[in-house]
């Protein structure tokens, strides 16, 4: 006997969260809970404004239609990426095919203060990895901050994300302020320039490795080994079903590329599932999941070690 619930939710964000020049005041999304006999599975559907092609209202419409079809015995996955991902997670939990083991070692997001980062890294076992957003301020400032961090913490490796913010000139201005002796400790820089060709040129000219992120979701993208390209950053909420995520990870690994499972600012429920996916598909790589502290609450499932208050399922708005 099948049953299902769909919940709508909204979490207040910290004041300083800006995405693509838009201030994100709340994180809005949906949960689906599928039950069959004694088993149940949960999934999160939370399109990311400015990044997802669909709105959460559109996702809600597709999700409710899919749930009604599933209750009638149809299991075909929807095409909309955020819905496909959430539904496939719920089905995987229901079938017990999403392993419970999780990788909660998130690469901490750094605001540029080395003292703050040293404290965060002190408790991190093994490899010291942190992430810095660049491209929000002047490229020269970004270069100076990155250089300062690498100089202050000799065993640090940085992941940088520019979200295609730079022209070739700005990319050169950034690199000019990063000591060439430190550049090998930049694990990768995600999408430095507005075009892939400019990003490839940046990697060749600076010796700083790059990673593809937005490019993975463009119709002309193909997985190929390229000089200067070291990694792909996979955001499942923007990608689609668990199977599609797994295919992308396998394609990257086959070329010797690092695959990083990364957050699209999901709630704690979605983040804990991403931690499980990371442990399953990319066990040797620290995922990019350090986004929970951008929110003012957790929901339904806790992230280990977080002190944020938890909103239980009874407090959510039920749609079905």
From Swiss-Prot:
Lineage, top-rank taxon, reads: Bacteria
Which UniProt keywords are present, listed alphabetically?
Answer: Lyase, Magnesium, Menaquinone biosynthesis, Metal-binding
Q: Which cofactors is this protein said to need?
A: a divalent metal cation
Q: Which top-level enzyme class is recorded in the Swiss-Prot or TrEMBL entry? A: lyase
GO BP: menaquinone biosynthetic process
**The family this protein is said to belong to:** Belongs to the mandelate racemase/muconate lactonizing enzyme family. MenC type 1 subfamily.
Tell me the protein's name. o-succinylbenzoate synthase
Q: Which organism is it from?
A: Escherichia coli O139:H28 (strain E24377A / ETEC)
């Amino acid at each position: 006997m099948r049953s299902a619930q769909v919940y709508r939710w909204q979490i207040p964000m910290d004041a300083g969260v800006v995405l693509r020049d838009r201030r994100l005041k709340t994180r809005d999304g949906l949960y689906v809970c599928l039950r069959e006999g004694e088993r149940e599975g949960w999934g999160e559907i939370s399109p990311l404004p400015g990044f997802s092609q669909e709105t959460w209202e559109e996702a809600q419409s597709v999700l409710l239609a899919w749930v009604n079809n599933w209750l009638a015995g149809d299991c075909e996955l929807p095409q909309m990426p955020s819905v496909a991902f959430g539904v496939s997670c719920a089905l995987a939990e229901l079938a017990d095919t999403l392993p419970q083991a999780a990788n909660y070692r998130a690469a901490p997001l750094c605001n540029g203060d080395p003292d703050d980062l040293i404290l965060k890294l002190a408790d991190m076992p093994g490899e010291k990895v942190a992430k810095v957003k660049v491209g929000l301020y002047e490229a020269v400032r970004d270069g100076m901050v990155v250089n300062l961090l690498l100089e202050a913490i000799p065993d640090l490796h940085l992941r940088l994300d520019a979200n295609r913010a730079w022209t070739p000139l700005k990319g050169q201005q950034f690199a000019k302020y990063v000591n060439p002796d430190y550049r090998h400790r930049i694990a990768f820089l995600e999408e430095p320039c507005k075009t892939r060709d400019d990003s490839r040129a940046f990697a060749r000219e600076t010796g700083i490795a790059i990673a593809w992120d937005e490019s993975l979701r463009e119709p002309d993208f193909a997985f190929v080994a390229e000089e200067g390209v070291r990694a792909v950053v996979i955001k499942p909420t923007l990608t689609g079903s668990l199977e599609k995520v797994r295919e992308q990870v396998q394609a990257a690994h086959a070329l010797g590329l690092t695959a990083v499972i990364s957050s699209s600012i999901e709630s704690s429920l979605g983040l804990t599932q991403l931690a499980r996916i990371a442990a399953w598909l990319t066990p040797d790589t620290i995922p990019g999941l350090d986004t929970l502290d951008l929110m003012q609450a957790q929901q339904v499932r806790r992230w280990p070690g977080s002190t944020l208050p938890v909103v239980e399922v009874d407090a959510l708005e039920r749609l079905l």
